[in-house]
Amino acid sequence: TIHAGKSVPNIWSIGSFTFQEKQAFACEPFVTTGEGLGFVHEGKVKNIFALASRKKTKDKEADEMLDYIWSNFNLLPFALRWLLEKWEEKEARRILEILIKKKAVHAYPVLVEGNGQRVAQAEHTFIPNENGVTITTNP
């Protein structure tokens, strides 16, 4: 996954912790149907990516995409659809595969509910401070 570190369960459990000031946290609830198993796992589809290396690949098209990714997204994750301003989808996928194989781009899988049911997800990032909390993902 993109995020790592502390996990906040829905209920208190052994190992629960207190939020510390000036640390950033991502609150990322998942909602499933009532028929779900109650957990998610990585699926096969990958539509979120992040730059892993700026090292040139010696492939002109791949290097052009690397430059575009760096200029537009830097080290932040990006969606395939954001590349479609410059490339057709089939071409973007082909070039991304080259970058993934050369370990220049990392692909993140879509999360799937344990028994294949639908999953909805939202996210806010927040930073506790002495006055409460700052939510950095507010519009």
Model-predicted segments: where are they?
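Active-site neighborhoods and metal-handling regions in enzymes and metal-associated proteins
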Residues: 1-139
